[in-house]
């Protein structure tokens, strides 16, 4: 990379970004801080919306058969698993896309792509002849939203000095992760809103005697996505980053710590994301008498809120290993007790154990990052 120069007062934004040097205190105070914070705000909002889209299917799946579809339990759970599978698989690829295409460019492209499954799903759920194969393609496309996390986290930290990078990443990932709670909280209101259905021209399904506007849960994200795309063009930037070395990428697979952390992250965040996606279907199957939609957001909200606490506690006792170990032991215990709650057909006990599972996942995920 060429030698960086100190921009002059009145320098263009393009010139400032081309000479990005956040570890230079003078540069940071005069030029860097404002631009970095603008990028962080837009990145965080975009990531929050991506998480909303990633869990969009989970809010609709439990209602499909009531709306006139005829999918088996196995098919519904398979569809619920696809967004997580695709998102997790593509995170490795997405991590390197900002360096290859530019952070602003890739954030724009990866967010723009999300409009495809959002619009398509809105029409698909209104047509009961939509095939299982079509829904498989749709849920796979929804999974792209989950991969946005890795590119967002890999890129936004480059704007900040090391002393502030942890806070920036915590805001970006922590707030973004709350998108799961946002979609679970808003979707029931949207699906029950005739006014919103009229705006979008949605045909309601009659489920248990009530008009349910399933497509609203998808269509309501069109405007926020378009707005954030417009803001990206004004307030995000492409930092000059070194292109990834393929040789270094291959070496990652030979590092035993990579595999150990991958396993731990699978057990922590994987458990969280998987259970959050499947919980609505599980309740619908085992406790059909429970109106679960109104409280579905609680577990993901708890996990998201406790994620930074897990990192803080790890720093406090200077051991992410201990926090992770205790959290995973708790996770195993609560998972077993969830099964007990199902066997007993005791929803309060089942739900309490589910929330404790999310508590353990939140602590474990934060500690694993540490």
Give the label of every model feature segment.
Residues 38-69, 275-280:
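Extracytoplasmic
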Residues 90-103, 306-319:
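Helix-to-loop junctions at the C-terminal end of transmembrane segments
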Residues 100-111, 315-329:
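Cytoplasmic membrane-interface "Motif A"-like loop-to-helix N-cap segments
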Residues 146, 166-192:
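Glycine-rich segments within core transmembrane alpha-helices of 12-TM secondary carriers
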Residues 222-242:
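C-terminal membrane-cytosol helix-exit motif in multi-pass small-molecule transporters
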Residues 320-368:
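C-terminal transmembrane helical hairpin of 12-TM major facilitator-type secondary transporters
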């Amino acid at each position: 990379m060429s030698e960086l120069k100190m921009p002059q007062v009145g320098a263009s934004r393009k010139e400032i970004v081309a000479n990005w040097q956040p570890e230079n205190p003078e540069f940071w105070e005069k030029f860097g801080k404002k631009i970095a914070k603008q990028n962080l705000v837009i990145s965080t909002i975009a990531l929050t919306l991506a998480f909303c889209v990633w869990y969009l299917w989970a809010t609709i799946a439990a209602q499909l058969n009531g709306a006139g579809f005829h999918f088996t339990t196995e098919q519904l759970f398979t569809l619920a698993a696809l967004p997580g599978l695709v998102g997790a698989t593509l995170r490795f690829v997405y991590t390197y896309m900002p360096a290859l295409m530019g952070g602003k460019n890739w954030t724009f492209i990866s967010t723009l792509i999300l409009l495809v499954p959002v619009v398509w799903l809105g029409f698909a759920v209104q047509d009961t002849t939509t095939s299982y194969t079509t829904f498989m393609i749709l849920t796979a496309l929804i999974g792209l939203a989950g991969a946005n996390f890795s590119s967002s986290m890999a890129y936004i930290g480059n704007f900040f000095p090391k002393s502030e990078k942890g806070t920036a990443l915590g805001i970006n990932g922590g707030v973004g992760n709350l998108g799961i709670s946002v979609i679970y909280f808003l979707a029931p209101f949207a699906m029950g809103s005739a006014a919103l259905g009229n705006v979008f021209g949605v045909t309601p399904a009659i489920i248990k005697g009530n008009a349910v506007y399933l497509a609203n849960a998808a269509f309501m994200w069109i405007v926020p996505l378009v707005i954030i795309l417009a803001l990206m063009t004004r307030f995000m930037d492409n930092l000059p980053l070194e292109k990834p070395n393929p040789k270094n990428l291959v070496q990652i697979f030979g590092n035993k710590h990579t595999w150990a952390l991958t396993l731990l992250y699978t057990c922590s965040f994987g458990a969280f994301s998987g259970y959050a996606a499947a919980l609505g279907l599980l309740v619908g199957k085992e406790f059909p008498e429970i109106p679960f939609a109104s409280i579905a957001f609680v577990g993901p909200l708890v996990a998201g809120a406790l994620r930074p606490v897990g990192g803080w506690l790890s720093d406090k006792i200077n051991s992410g290993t201990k926090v992770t170990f205790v959290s995973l032991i708790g996770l195993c215990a609560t998972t077993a007790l969830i099964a007990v709650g199902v066997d007993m057909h005791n929803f309060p006990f089942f739900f309490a154990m589910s929330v404790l599972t999310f508590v353990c996942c939140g602590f474990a995920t934060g500690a694993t990052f540490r």
